[in-house]
Regions:
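Extended charged/polar low-complexity repeat regions
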Residues: 215-216, 220-225, 234, 256, ...
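Bacterial N-terminal signal peptides that target proteins for export
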Residues: 1-8
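Intrinsically disordered, low-complexity segments enriched in small residues
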Residues: 3, 16, 21-265
Length: 828
């Protein structure tokens, strides 16, 4: 995209557009036979819960001391005013001794010296006393520590008596304990299915589908991505919801994107990941080392060591590399997302530490340590900061049990995250104080009731209106999505799973989707549709070949494309033929496209287009620099060639574009603010790496004089010296555009829908929407209006124009058939 268009795109866009039960267990070979790819891992360890015990006994005074140490008030034999139980002390191990000291001081009254405490050691048996345990620690489950206790440690202090500091210490013995759940991730089979020799028992990924006996409870049942509705995957029953809280601008921008996935299972009940939550998990399964790349979007890919490399399933192109020191010890991992050539680096524990773009721009991730202030995080290992290549930051804080509490964007604005008692995300409060709420396992929408937990059943938007609903069957498979008023309702029936499913749209039209299992992946092989408006039933078709690459695709009209060849080492298409008959015969419209590819990047270097006779019609050739940026692009057709030439800066941003003309100079030039620039205007870092000037072929210069902290332009000066000033709201929406003293204002509702545009002369247009976020009316300042009636599919079935006296002046009606195609329009 032209860099100038990139920086002013938001303004331009606004101006141009107004708006069940457990499955049968089978072995690994059966799993693969039935289309799954067995993925297993060790039990998951939950968060430690700490406790401190004083050797006192049951005394009211001791109960009062404990109550006060927790921040409560003792009244009428009860402790009141306590914080929620998940926030009770001790939140971390570091709070054990301070809590014991507080209890001691509250119990013994005023002290003139102390309290003082001796140290403690984990793993010591306590065999007597009021704080005794059943046995010495630690207690292990499958080799993982589940419980441990400390030796007695002593808290002492001198009491003040009669104004005199006591001669001897008063003492009290305490012990501490820590416990955590050790089990398979929620949703996995809890019986630890796989045991290999002396290797600790392993968990199996428990996808639960309502079919028997062909059920792979320990399979990562992978399927082709084909989403319907808002959205769900019809074959897997996966509900996936992407919510973008923050999006910066410029090269390799900061972004905070949350992803809900109903089949993410972790011990604390969370169902949301974010774009910085990818991780690597490594296990030695007997003699076969295996690593899992858990992606931010909810998918997990397994990589098996073949003696020299970690190799994924044949349909996965992304690369995983183990990093070691000179002695062969694991130091980290690198994951290459091949499509974008983005390189992710992980530490030895599998935490994501950096993300580097193809141009070499890096975002760095920082995590909490034992020395991190409690106001930021109470425990180590939590993401607290992401810093981009230019110094802009996202900062995060957490509550006492490790849940993300706030995010601060580069402008210093704060986003708040709220949770229910199951630690499920229930509310996000944005910088404009608007709330977006999430509902789970609601009656009538989750057939299994509270199981599986964490099923997203509804979203209430920032207008405080319920916008979306999702329904699940008794085993947690999503089968229906709809917007407010049953708009865009899509219902999936899994009765013939996994060979086919049926999908019913909001019009009641039923389509059947069929699937084929290949290399552990279910691939869509076709969709049928019913007859409509005199046209008979029809179906699409698809077939697949080596490495699950598509070999043929046919649309509803019988038009066919053959995929002739691939570079199978990289799964890159090298030849396809389009415009064939249903049987594969050539037609006058037939053409073949042949592609050659860059040796490193998934970028074409030569595209050749031929007609049905094999005659070359056009070629497009590209050369690239070492970062994959296009240096030259040449199009040759009819014996004529045109060439564009590009240059770039160190950030991969375009410096010059030299067009194809040779008779005149047609070079456009761009300059950028330095990576270390301290910028004029509202934000010191906002302009870094952003466009500073654009000079066209005639030498006319447009400059962007100011940027905000998000990288959005605030002041644009055109070649005539005329300045355009732009103002945004806290959600980065354009609210004002002043050009030479003439101001246009924009207003939005809570979800960001444009409500009103007021022009410099005071005239305006206002926009009205329904609860499903669809435009239903446009009104001008004189009172003229256009009203839209929409069906459940979003089609405008009626348009009515009213004048200032509310008199109907014109009506337009439309009728749509079963397949949602317009068949009738009337202008009475």
């Amino acid at each position: 995209m032209n860099p100038l268009m990139r920086v002013i795109g938001l303004a331009a866009a606004i101006l141009l557009f107004a708006p069940a039960g457990h499955a049968q267990t089978i072995n690994r070979s059966q799993c693969i036979q039935y289309g799954g790819n067995a993925i297993c891992w060790g039990p998951v360890q939950g968060r430690w819960k700490h406790a401190v015990c004083g050797e006192v006994g049951s005394f009211t005074s001791w109960s009062i001391a404990q109550c006060q140490a927790q921040g409560g008030t003792w009244a009428n034999g009860n402790c009141t005013g306590l914080p929620p139980q998940e926030l009770w002390r001790p939140a971390t191990e570091g709070d054990l001794v301070p809590l014991a000291k507080d209890q001691f001081s509250n119990f013994h009254g005023p002290l003139c010296d102390g309290p003082n405490a001796t140290g403690y050691t984990w793993g010591v048996a306590i065999s007597s006393g009021l704080c005794s345990t059943a046995g010495p620690g630690p207690v292990l489950v499958q080799g993982y520590e589940q419980h441990n206790n400390t030796n007695f440690f002593t808290v002492s202090g001198k009491k003040l008596s009669g104004g005199v500091c006591g001669p001897a210490d008063t003492t009290l013995n305490f012990s501490a304990s820590r416990d955590r759940p050790v089990q398979c991730p929620g949703g996995d089979d809890q019986s630890f299915l796989f045991t290999t020799g002396s290797t600790p028992a392993l968990c199996s990924l428990g996808f639960r589908y309502p079919i028997t006996p062909r059920q792979c409870s320990e399979c990562d049942a992978k399927f082709a991505n084909q989403q319907v509705g808002n959205p769900i995957d019809p074959i897997t029953g996966v509900k996936r919801q992407v919510e973008v809280d923050y999006a910066g601008s410029g090269p390799h921008p900061l972004r905070f994107e949350r992803v809900y996935h109903n089949r993410i299972y972790v011990l604390d009940g969370k169902k949301w990941r974010h774009n910085y939550s990818a991780r690597i998990e490594f296990h030695n399964f007997g003699t076969v080392p295996t690593a899992f790349a858990h992606r931010a979007g909810g998918r997990s890919y397994s990589y098996t060591f073949n003696g020299s490399l970690f190799v994924p399933n044949v349909d996965i192109d992304d690369k995983l590399t183990k990093l070691t020191d000179a002695g062969g010890a694991l130091t980290g991992w690198q994951f290459l997302e091949v499509a974008s050539h983005t390189l992710e680096t992980y530490d030895a524990a599998g935490k994501l530490v950096s993300i580097t773009s193809r141009a070499g721009l890096t975002q760095t991730l920082e995590y909490s340590t034992v020395s991190t202030p409690p106001a930021v995080a109470h425990e180590p290992g939590l993401l607290i900061r992401v810093t981009d290549h230019f110094g802009r930051q996202l900062n995060f804080t957490y509550d006492a049990i490790g849940r993300m509490a706030t995010m601060q964007d580069p402008a210093g604005q704060t986003y708040l995250y709220g949770y229910n008692s199951q630690s499920l995300l229930t509310k996000v409060t944005y910088p404009d104080s608007k709330d977006r709420e999430y509902l789970y396992n609601e009656a009538g929408l989750a057939a299994g009731g509270a199981w599986p937990p964490g099923l997203l059943t509804g979203i209430q938007d920032e207008n405080n209106v319920r916008f979306a609903s999702y329904s699940y069957d008794s085993v947690g498979m999503a089968y229906r999505t709809e917007h407010a008023g049953v708009v865009n309702r899509v219902t999936v029936s899994h009765g013939s799973w996994p060979s086919s499913v049926t999908v019913t749209d909001a019009r009641g039209t039923v389509r059947t989707h069929t699937y084929q299992s290949l290399n552990g992946v279910y691939l869509n092989t076709g969709v049928t549709q019913p007859a409509a408006n005199g046209v008979g039933t029809a179906a699409t078709a698809a077939t697949y070949g080596t490495n699950n690459n598509i070999s043929m695709r046919r649309d509803f009209n019988g038009n066919r494309t053959n995929y002739n060849s691939y570079d199978l080492t990289r799964n890159l298409e090298t030849s396809r033929t389009e415009g064939l008959t249903s049987a594969g015969a050539t037609t006058p419209a037939t053409r073949t496209i042949e592609s050659q590819w860059h040796a490193t990047f998934r970028l074409p270097t030569l595209i050749t287009e031929k007609n049905s006779a094999g005659t070359v019609l056009r070629t497009t050739s590209m050369t690239h620099d070492s970062n994959g940026n296009v240096l030259t692009r040449t199009i040759t057709a009819g014996g004529n060639s045109r060439t564009w030439t590009y240059t770039y800066d160190a950030n991969g941003a375009v410096l010059t574009v030299d067009g194809p003309r040779t008779d005149v100079t047609d070079v456009t030039t761009y300059t950028y603010y330095a990576n270390s620039a301290t910028c004029p205007g509202a934000a010191a870092l906002g302009c870094r790496g952003q466009v500073e000037t654009v000079t066209n072929a005639a030498g006319h210069v447009t400059s962007i004089a100011e940027y905000d902290a998000h990288g959005r332009p605030l002041a644009i000066v055109d070649p005539n010296g005329l300045t355009t000033d732009l103002v945004y709201d806290p959600r980065q929406r354009l609210t004002s555009r002043n050009v030479g003293g003439e101001t246009t204002d924009y207003e939005y509702d809570g979800v960001g829908q444009l409500k009103k545009v007021t022009l410099p002369d005071g005239s305006f247009l206002s926009y009205t929407y329904d609860a499903a976020h669809r435009l239903t009316q446009v009104t001008d300042n004189a009172g003229n209006r256009i009203a839209y009636t929409l069906d459940a599919m979003g089609n405008r079935t009626k348009e009515e124009v009213f004048d200032t006296t509310n008199t109907l002046k014109r009506t337009l009606t439309r009728v749509y058939e079963t397949l949602n195609r317009l068949i009738y329009e009337a202008h009475p």
